[in-house]
A protein has these predicted regions:
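Glycine-rich, mobile lid/loop segments that gate access to catalytic sites or pores
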Residues: 14-50
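Catalytic micro-motifs at enzyme active sites that drive phosphoryl/nucleotidyl and oxygen chemistry
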Residues: 18, 84-85
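Long, contiguous amphipathic alpha-helices that act as assembly "spine/axial" helices in icosahedral shell
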Residues: 1-29, 97, 183-185
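Sequence/fold signature of self-assembling virion shell proteins
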Residues: 38-84, 91-96, 102-196
């Protein structure tokens, strides 16, 4: 029981570090992400080192629209048109929708309603019967209620690496004469993003 508050604090800190990449994706935060481009992880200014390649289309992974059925669908289409370093279409299919706690109900409306959530015309909702359903992932540590993003789970796991150098460890030491106890804990972990 004496370790419980310390363990809870450690878990909270680890989760903050794990979601920092998403929390600061639109700023040039280089705590866990450093690129030769010198732009944010989510940016409309991505470049390529391949000579004579136009970055006019397919290199913009920044969207600023509020979460709605229209913006969700537009971003899915945009992801399918992302290009690699040689400007070839990658056809990346989003299967995860990441949202803060505040947007979870809106995400559920968009993805799971049988009918179009913002229409009185009784149109069908194509997301509700998608062949590859999208999973809602709630980022509990996001503080901006406008943040949301689409990801491909396979590429996310491949490109955002998490490692634990030292798993959380706890120990106590007691003094025989005074019955005083010291409690300590430690852990070392890190994360990095290999590619946007």
């Amino acid at each position: 029981d004496m370790f419980e508050p310390m363990a809870r604090s450690g878990i909270y800190t680890r989760q903050q570090h794990a979601t920092r990449v998403l929390q600061f994706a639109t700023s040039n935060d280089q705590t866990f992400y450093v690129r030769s481009e010198g732009v944010a992880l989510a940016s409309n200014s991505h470049t390529t080192r391949t000579p004579n390649v136009s970055t006019t289309t397919g290199f913009d992974n920044l969207a600023t629209a509020a979460l709605s059925p229209t913006s969700y669908r537009a971003n899915r289409i945009s992801m399918r048109q992302f290009r690699n370093d040689r400007a070839q279409i990658c056809n990346i299919i989003a299967d995860e929708l990441w949202v803060p706690i505040d947007l979870e109900p809106r995400a559920e409306e968009i993805l799971y309603s049988d009918k179009h959530p913002d229409s009185a015309e009784n149109r069908i909702n194509p997301e509700a019967s998608a062949r590859r359903p999208t999973t809602i992932k709630v980022a509990h540590h996001w503080t901006d209620t406008n943040n949301w993003c689409l990801m491909n789970s396979v590429l996310r796991k491949r490109n955002q690496v998490w490692w634990e150098r030292i798993r959380p460890q706890y120990r106590t030491i007691g003094d025989f004469d005074t019955f005083q106890i010291k409690v300590g804990g430690r852990g070392r972990w890190g994360t990095m993003v290999l590619d946007w």
